[in-house]
């Protein structure tokens, strides 16, 4: 042969194994199931899955389907379509979905399952009530480990919901590790058919369950709260089912019926069904199938084969026995010819010994031998290879003792456990049909005895005399303990000569090794469960070579010497396993073979032996070679336990996997909080039916048992240790649980390979290697990403698929225990542990196990259920009914959920009186946020409250007291009535005199004019709403969704069509409605507010678009402000809010909002409209983020907590009200300026509550005492400057809204000029007033963010000092409509000039104004509040005051709780501020928060007329000295350091009226709605004289008198 050809053949021979293995690996990866890769294991490719319907579809006949196995893919649920009966089992497993994914799934046709229902790890499924609403029967013909229903690790399952299930004919119910599953104990399982308590295994399900059934449920038995268990009230006879209405079904019905007493309308049949009718037995000519239906012979034979490949067969009944349709013939029956002698489909009864014929089988263990039990004839070869076991001979005799004939050959190979063949006690005939493949050495053989190390005897002598081998001889080799004479004796009984057989005289009867040639073996490729070996050929005469035997075994320690014969005794389990391969043809071809079914990451020893004919003089064998398989996915960690030892921690421990399949380096712990379903607890009255904590019950039981043990002898005895029986019982329970879990995993997670066919085993062809076996291999899809973990514990968060909760992951190394920190108290957590290996270069991935899952709840926090005592309050009805309403706030973060409240109360100071305790359910509390005690006796009462949560903690508040007033005596009532009448008379007389005086005083002014103007805020109650041009057709309004609740009703987002010029135009609008239950006055008020808004046409005031007054309900169509009110807008932009991507507003944005609010308020002020409720909640934000003044009182009910009911008056926004409004009820535009300052404080703090820490009553006292809020931390200069001036105590010292706009103009956007009221002809703007706006930033820009400055310097802008004679707010002095200065809107000239120092000072003396801010870093891009939001802590400060000369004694303490130390005593309001000069900063930190900088202005005298403040001031009443603030006013007037703006003649305002204005002021104070216009004064520029208008009309005065009489 040419050398080149030899080299080429050698290359080909070397490449073939590698190519074959590559193809093999590709085939394995192709077969990996992607659906199961997320579970880290590949599902089973098992023949029975064809029966279960995996991966295929069914075409049910008459609604009958075979077994169904649904996993991983929602498409597989199509297998259940049109199925009425599943003849088999239903298995659903391995889904990770959401609840929404199952809500569209429903199979109402399914009524019966003949085997079992199994569900495993179907995440997202909450109930079966919609999935199988009509499932009525589970027969349990075949069980899953003795159970008919199995629910295992169903994480989201809350209830079974099998509302129509009536019968479980056989088997138990196992519900395990379903940590949300409730309503188990409310089911009468005995009624369904599971009467044995041992058959009900309910383990590790939810402990605290509502388990409350509605009242209609009999005996409180139900599947869910609203679904009662059916059939409990059945009054029919025994074993008869009922309909829902109690009507009896027919006796033949099982599980219920549709129509009473009708066998055609049964859900299922007790016996059999034929033609959709229930019958007691099958009619003649039909065959009973599966004990439930009758088939004709054609229908029976047309059935598909069963999973084992058996064809259907007919069995004709005899002597009244039913005819059957079967897959296998029963005992005493054999398969025979059918009546027409055309096919083998008939089971025929045996006359004597039934020749039960079975197919040939390979027996590798006792279980395989049991398959041939009762068989008398084996058609085909019988192969036995049992290497080990206990009582093997006895078990084989039971299974094989009836065999009389084996038609082909008997192979007994490598059965090391066999000593004799006596178990074949009835064997007589062998080899009636010997195949040609069983020919060796030109001869055929029927009996093979090979390599049976411990075989000593063959058959009993008496039996050998009866035995016959019809064809061929016997082949006996390598039976070391089988003596040659025994073999010869057996041949003599068979009448066979040695020439007809192959018997080795060398290898039988001894274990002496033969002369051998060495073979070389190498490992070509390795997988996790397979290896490919290659070895050189047998060098001797190939004609003498029979086969190659691969011997291999697992070794624990490679360091020990490995001997071929070591351990090969009768009782050892450490034996060599073998694989047999036929010789490869070809002169130079190397031999290859594959070992499969290996364990991952395991070391094996292997050697190869060449078997030759008996006449061969040489044998061959390799040396022992070792190799280690690749690692694979570990099994799940075992004994996973989570223990709660702290409210915020869980200690998790586990044990390593049973099958690590590699080197376990770390564990992943994935956990997340399970959301509490609060709705499920609303279905139960916990006052009537209290919750019993399962763990507490167990604890009590354990304690009682401990007491019994401890008290058995004496008190010094300790608890006895557990007995051996108790320990064995516990061990047995653990073993049962482990066995069931292994059994479950075996059927859910299975390897994907099949057994090699026997013929391939003997005729191996290396070219067919990839097609021989289909095996698992690691899939990169199931591996984790490559990570580096530098620390012992690494924590990161991620979102798992199909989960909305935040999922956390912890990785631990070198330990099987971890503590999970920072958990929420009394919260349930799902904990999953995965065992993982490091990245492996051989498998190119990091392998992890499937998840071990457990659930645990953290311990409760005792303080979490405590009610905040500051929220407890009482309201006593004033009608002497003895009714007291007690209100409180629920704990903000309770232990799970507050179920009820306990209210304890009794008469005070009566110790012997038994207190009363009232239980208040959660639903009752939520109705009124409190509870009303009725008909209490007058006197002093004490009470306390406790909240009871799921943790069942009970902690009462401290005792509180209230007094129920005693009703007045009849005599005293009469006296009071008389006194009241007298006082009323004199009051009316006094008022009449005052009115007359006023009228007379105004009458004598002959040159006066009478001007009556309508005040938009006060409309006479007699006036009804009249439709006008604002009326809109109701059909043009379409409501889309709810936006929130208004004061009168719901507010909707809607669309208005054709309300503008274009009839087809649709615009988004906000639609306000009135509740259906609203009174007439409420509807009138609702439309009155709309009437008020008709007068407003300003860009920065929310526009009214129309009104629908006809019909009900009335609608007010407003401009849609898409971003809601400013309060919620600011809160939504806090850094601590959970709004990804939303940043706090920048400083320029806040200043822009402030300018827009000021512009809207300036417009209202010019319209003579006093808002009285300016707050962030009443400012609305458009989609373009433009802020507009809101809806004037319509939002009051939404923020009810922001209002306070003072005395018997209406709700007042006291936290936004000016001092004069709180004390005297005076509301002006300047009191709105005070509120504007509070709004700016809200904007700086992102909508924190003003005066935090103080109650409403304390706020009133706080402001009345002369204190203001502290500026927020990091307050910007501009905002601090404005707030300080807006909060001036005297109204005339506050800026006007137009002055505020001019101050803010340099920071406002250019677009402001185009849309603002300020820049209109009546808005007051003059040329130059807007210079330096945002469009052209100069060096004076100060765009610092809100936290860029300290609070101490917040109001100290870095200024450019330029001489100026203006005041604080630099503005134009002349504009259309009159002069415009710092003071506007009715500030009295004389009041301004009262006590003003008249000294002139030159510019050199330091008269400077704040013209602009100085240079600073531009950080306008920074967020408004970059740090986490910290609610400002309010401290008490005095109001701005510059005229007081008091001392410490003048500052009265209001008695409020101090949240922080009082202001520095050296900086009290009585101290005067130093005059500013060119070297002093008017906003230095020492003044911030206490009083504003002192600026001087030029004083312009007017006709030299200066009068004292006391002479011009008019007070309606003398202030209560207890309510007045610090002494801040001096009789000497304003100090020289006070503000002194330019004086100007202005109209008197309500809070500065003269004596002649007393009627108007009085009416306002009394709250009248009569529109009385004050005397108004106007300015004559040429003379600077005052002109008074005419007095009110006499009819107006008469109306006032009538109102007073009524009061």
Swiss-Prot record:
| Catalytic class of the enzyme | transferase
Q: In its UniProt record, which GO terms are filed under biological process?
A: glucose homeostasis; positive regulation of MAPK cascade; positive regulation of phosphatidylinositol 3-kinase/protein kinase B signal transduction
Q: Where in the cell is it found?
A: Membrane
Residues bound to ATP: 1043-1051, 1072
**Which Pfam family is one of this chain's hits?**
Furin-like
Cofactor(s) the protein requires to work: Mn(2+)
Q: Which residues carry this modification: Phosphotyrosine?
A: 1199
What keywords tag this UniProt record?
ATP-binding, Cleavage on pair of basic residues, Disulfide bond, Glycoprotein, Kinase, Manganese, Membrane, Metal-binding, Nucleotide-binding, Phosphoprotein, Receptor, Repeat, Signal, Transferase, Transmembrane, Transmembrane helix, Tyrosine-protein kinase
| Compositional bias (Polar residues) | 1503-1515
> What family classification does the UniProt entry report for this protein?
Belongs to the protein kinase superfamily. Tyr protein kinase family. Insulin receptor subfamily.
Q: How does it assemble?
A: Probable tetramer of 2 alpha and 2 beta chains linked by disulfide bonds. The alpha chains contribute to the formation of the ligand-binding domain, while the beta chains carry the kinase domain.
Put simply, this protein is called Putative molluscan insulin-related peptide(s) receptor
Q: What's the source species for this entry? A: Lymnaea stagnalis (Great pond snail)
UniProt lineage: Eukaryota, Metazoa, Spiralia, Lophotrochozoa, Mollusca
């Amino acid at each position: 042969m040419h050398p080149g050809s030899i080299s080429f053949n050698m290359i080909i021979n070397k490449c073939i194994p590698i190519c074959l293995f590559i193809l093999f690996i590709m085939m394995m990866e192709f077969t990996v199931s992607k659906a199961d890769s997320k579970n880290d294991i590949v599902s089973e490719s098992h023949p029975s899955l064809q029966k279960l319907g995996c991966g295929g579809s069914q075409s049910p006949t008459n609604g009958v389907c075979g077994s169904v196995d649904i996993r991983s893919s929602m498409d597989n649920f199509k297998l259940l379509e049109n199925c009425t009966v599943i003849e088999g089992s239903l298995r659903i497993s391995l889904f990770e979905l959401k609840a929404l994914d199952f809500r569209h799934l429903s199979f109402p046709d399914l009524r019966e399952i003949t085997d079992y229902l199994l569900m495993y790890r179907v995440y997202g499924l909450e109930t079966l009530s919609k999935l199988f609403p009509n499932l009525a029967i589970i027969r349990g013909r075949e069980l899953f480990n003795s159970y008919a229903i199995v629910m295992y690790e169903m994480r989201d399952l809350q209830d079974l919901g099998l509302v129509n299930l009536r019968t479980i004919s056989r088997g138990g119910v196992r519900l395990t590790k379903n940590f949300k599953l409730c309503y188990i104990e409310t089911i009468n399982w005995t009624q369904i058919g599971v009467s044995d308590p041992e058959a009900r295994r309910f383990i590790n399900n939810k402990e605290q369950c509502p388990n409350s059934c509605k009242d209609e449920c009999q005996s409180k038995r139900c599947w869910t709260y609203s679904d009662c268990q059916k059939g409990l009230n059945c009054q029919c006879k025994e074993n008869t089912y009922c309909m829902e209405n109690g009507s009896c079904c027919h006796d033949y019905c099982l599980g219920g019926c549709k129509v009473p007493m009708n066998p055609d309308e049964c859900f299922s049949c007790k016996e059999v069904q034929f033609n959709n009718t229930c019958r007691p037995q099958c009619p003649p000519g039909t065959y009973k199938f599966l004990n439930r239906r009758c088939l004709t012979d054609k229908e029976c034979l047309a059935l598909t084969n069963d999973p084992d490949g058996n064809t259907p067969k007919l069995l004709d009944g005899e002597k009244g026995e039913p005819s059957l349709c079967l897959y296998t013939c029963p005992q005493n029956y054999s398969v025979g010819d059918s009546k027409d002698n055309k096919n083998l489909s008939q089971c025929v009864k045996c006359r004597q010994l039934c020749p039960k014929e079975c197919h040939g089988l390979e027996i590798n263990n006792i279980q395989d031998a049991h398959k041939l039990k009762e068989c008398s004839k084996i058609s085909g070869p019988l192969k036995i290879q049992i290497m080990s076991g206990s009582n093997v001979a006895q078990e084989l005799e039971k299974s094989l003792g009836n065999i009389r004939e084996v038609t082909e050959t008997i192979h007994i190979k490598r059965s090391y456990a066999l000593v004799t063949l006596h178990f074949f006690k009835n064997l007589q005939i062998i080899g009636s049909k010997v195949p040609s493949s069983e020919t060796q050495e030109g001869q055929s053989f029927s009996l093979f005895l090979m390599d049976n190390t411990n075989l000593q005897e063959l058959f009993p002598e008496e039996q050998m005399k009866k035995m016959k081998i019809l064809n061929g001889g016997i082949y006996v080799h390598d039976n070391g303990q089988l003596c040659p004479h025994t073999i010869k004796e057996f041949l003599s009984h068979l009448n066979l000569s040695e020439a007809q057989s192959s018997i080795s005289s060398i290898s039988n009867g001894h274990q002496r090794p033969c002369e051998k040639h060495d073979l070389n073996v190498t490992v070509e490729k390795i997988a996790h469960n397979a290896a490919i070996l290659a070895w050189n050929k047998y060098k001797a005469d190939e004609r003498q070579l029979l086969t190659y035997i691969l011997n291999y075994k697992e070794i624990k320690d490679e360091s020990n010497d490995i001997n071929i014969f070591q351990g090969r005794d009768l009782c050892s389990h450490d034996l060599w396993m073998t694989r047999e391969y036929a010789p490869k043809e070809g002169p130079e071809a190397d031999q290859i073979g594959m070992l499969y079914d290996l364990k991952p990451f395991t070391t094996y020893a292997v050697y190869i032996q060449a078997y030759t004919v008996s006449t061969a003089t040489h044998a061959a064998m390799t040396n022992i070679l070792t190799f280690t398989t690749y690692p694979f996915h570990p099994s799940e960690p075992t004994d996973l336990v989570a223990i709660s030892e702290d409210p915020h921690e869980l200690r998790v421990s586990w044990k390593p996997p049973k099958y690590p399949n590699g080197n376990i380096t770390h564990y992943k712990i994935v956990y997340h909080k399970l959301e509490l379903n609060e709705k499920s607890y609303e279905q139960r009255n916990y006052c009537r039916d209290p919750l019993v904590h399962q763990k507490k019950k167990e604890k009590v039981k354990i304690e009682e048992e401990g007491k019994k043990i401890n008290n058995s002898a004496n008190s010094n005895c300790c608890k006895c240790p557990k007995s051996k029986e108790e320990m064995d019982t516990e061990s047995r329970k653990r073993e049962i649980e482990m066995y069931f879990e292994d059994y479950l995993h075996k059927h859910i997670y299975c390897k994907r390979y099949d057994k090699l066919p026997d013929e391939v085993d003997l005729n191996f062809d290396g070219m067919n290697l990839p097609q021989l076996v289909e095996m698992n291999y690691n899939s990169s899809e199931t591996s984790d990403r490559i990570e580096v973990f530098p620390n012992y514990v690494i924590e990161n968060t991620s979102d798992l698929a199909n989960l909305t909760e935040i999922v956390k992951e912890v990785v631990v190394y070198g330990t099987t225990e971890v503590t999970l920190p920072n958990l929420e108290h009394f919260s349930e957590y799902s904990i999953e542990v995965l065992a993982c290996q490091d990245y492996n270069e051989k498998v190119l991935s990091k392998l992890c196990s499937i998840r071990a899952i457990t659930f645990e709840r953290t311990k409760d926090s005792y303080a979490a259920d405590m009610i905040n005592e500051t929220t407890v309050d009482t309201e006593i009805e004033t009608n002497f009914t003895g009714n007291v309403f007690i209100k409180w706030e629920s704990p903000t973060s309770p232990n799970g959920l507050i179920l009820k409240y306990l209210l304890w109360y009794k008469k005070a100071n009566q110790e012997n009186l038994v207190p009363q305790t009232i239980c208040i359910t959660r639903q009752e509390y939520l109705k009124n946020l409190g509870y009303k005690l009725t008909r209490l006796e007058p006197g002093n009462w004490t009470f306390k409250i406790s909240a009871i949560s799921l943790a069942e903690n009970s902690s009462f508040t401290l005792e509180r007291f209230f007094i129920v007033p005693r009703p007045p005596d009849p005599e005293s009532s009469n006296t009071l009535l008389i006194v009241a009448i007298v006082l009323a008379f004199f009051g009316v007389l006094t008022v009449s005199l005052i009115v007359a005086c006023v009228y007379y005083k105004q009458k004598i002014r002959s040159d006066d004019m009478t001007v009556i103007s309508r005040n938009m805020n006060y409309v006479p109650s007699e006036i009804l709403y009249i439709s006008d041009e604002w009326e809109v057709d109701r059909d043009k309004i379409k409501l889309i969704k709810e936006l929130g609740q208004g004061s009168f009703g719901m507010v909707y987002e809607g669309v208005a069509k054709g309300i503008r010029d274009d009839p087809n135009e649709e615009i988004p609008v906000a639609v306000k409605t009135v509740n259906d239950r609203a009174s007439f006055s409420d509807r009138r008020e609702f439309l009155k507010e709309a009437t008020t808004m008709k007068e407003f046409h300003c860009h920065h005031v929310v526009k009214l678009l129309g009104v629908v007054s006809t019909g009900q309900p009335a609608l007010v169509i407003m401009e849609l402000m898409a971003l809601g009110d400013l309060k919620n807008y600011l809160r939504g932009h806090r850094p601590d809010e959970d709004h990804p991507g939303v940043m706090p507003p920048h400083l320029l944005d806040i200043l822009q909002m402030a300018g827009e609010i000021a512009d809207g308020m300036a417009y209202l002020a010019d319209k003579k409209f006093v808002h009285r409720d300016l707050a962030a909640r009443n400012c609305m934000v458009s989609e373009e983020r433009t802020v507009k003044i809101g809806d004037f009182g319509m939002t009051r009910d939404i923020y009810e907590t922001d209002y306070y009911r003072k005395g018997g008056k209406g709700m007042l926004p006291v936290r936004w009200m000016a001092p004069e409004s709180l004390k005297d009820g005076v509301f002006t535009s300047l009191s709105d300026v005070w509120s504007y300052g509070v709004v700016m404080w809200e904007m700086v703090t992102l909508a924190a509550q003003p005066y935090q820490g103080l109650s409403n009553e304390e706020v009133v006292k706080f402001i009345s005492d002369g204190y203001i809020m502290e500026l927020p931390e990091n307050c910007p200069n501009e905002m601090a400057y404005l707030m300080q001036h807006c909060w001036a105590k005297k109204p005339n010292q506050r800026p006007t809204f137009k002055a505020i706009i001019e101050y803010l103009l340099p920071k406002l956007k250019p677009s402001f000029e185009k849309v603002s009221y300020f820049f209109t002809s009546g808005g007051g703007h003059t040329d130059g007033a807007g210079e330096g706006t945002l469009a052209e930033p100069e060096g004076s820009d100060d765009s610092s963010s809100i936290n860029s400055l300290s609070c101490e310097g917040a109001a100290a802008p870095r200024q450019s000092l330029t001489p100026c004679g203006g005041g604080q707010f630099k503005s134009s002095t002349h504009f259309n409509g009159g002069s415009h200065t710092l003071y506007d809107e009715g500030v009295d000239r004389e009041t301004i000039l009262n006590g003003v120092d008249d000294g002139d000072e030159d510019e050199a003396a330091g008269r400077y104004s704040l013209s602009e801010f100085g240079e600073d870093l531009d950080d306008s891009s920074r967020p408004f509040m970059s740090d986490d939001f910290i609610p400002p802590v309010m401290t008490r400060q005095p109001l701005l005051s510059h005229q007081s000369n008091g001392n410490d004694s003048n500052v009265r303490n209001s008695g409020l709780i101090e949240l922080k130390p009082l202001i520095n005593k050296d900086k009290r309001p009585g101290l005067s501020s130093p005059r500013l000069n060119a070297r002093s900063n008017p906003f230095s930190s020492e003044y911030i928060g206490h009083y504003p900088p002192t600026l001087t202005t030029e004083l312009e005298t007017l006709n030299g007329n200066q009068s004292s403040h006391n002479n011009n001031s008019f007070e309606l009443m003398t202030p209560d000295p207890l309510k007045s603030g610090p002494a801040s006013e001096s009789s000497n007037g304003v100090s020289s350091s006070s503000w002194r703006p330019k004086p100007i003649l202005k109209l008197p305002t309500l809070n500065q009226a003269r004596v002649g204005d007393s009627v108007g002021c009085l009416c306002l104070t009394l709250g009248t709605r009569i529109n009385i216009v004050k005397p108004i004064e106007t300015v004559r520029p040429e003379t600077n004289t005052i002109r008074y208008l005419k007095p009110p009309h006499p009819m107006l005065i008469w109306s006032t008198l009538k109102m007073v009489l009524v009061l």
